[in-house]
Regions:
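Basic, amphipathic alpha-helical patches used to engage nucleic acids or provide basic targeting signals
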Residues: 18-23, 46-115
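Solvent-exposed, charged helical/coil patches
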Residues: 1-42, 116-123
């Protein structure tokens, strides 16, 4: 991954914008619950560009990426991505789209628990 001070390539920013406008139902629901500090005051960004990746949701204070997966996920690419991010100190919390839609409260509790633990352990 490039150093954090480098500007993002224009195409990377544009792709993140496109992903924000074509969100899945699960992403829309979760974003409604995460935006504007609604989850315990935690600040999340959606479709956050972190080259070479774009993270579904990212909490910088906790260095936590939340990825919502459908049936197309779960392969070697996801494992390599998680490994790359973990080397940067970012934990990846993978959840299924169905979970976000059907068990929203449980998903939010898990995100809050993990984020809170990471923030507390960083002090």
């Amino acid at each position: 991954m490039p150093p954090k001070h480098r500007p993002l390539p224009a195409w990377h920013k544009q792709r993140a914008r496109e992903l924000r406008t074509t969100a899945t139902d699960a992403e829309v629901r979760l974003w409604y619950c995460l935006r504007s500090g609604r989850l315990g005051g935690l600040k999340f960004r959606r479709q956050h560009p972190l080259p070479p990746y774009i993270l579904d949701f990212y909490c910088e204070a906790a260095k936590l990426a939340v990825e919502l997966d459908g049936s197309q996920h779960g392969g070697e690419d996801d494992a390599a991505r998680a490994s790359d991010l973990e080397r940067e100190g970012i934990m990846v919390l993978r959840l299924w789209n169905d979970q976000a839609l059907k068990e929203t409260e449980a998903v939010l509790q898990e995100i809050y628990r993990v984020a809170s633990e990471r923030i507390a352990s960083d002090r």
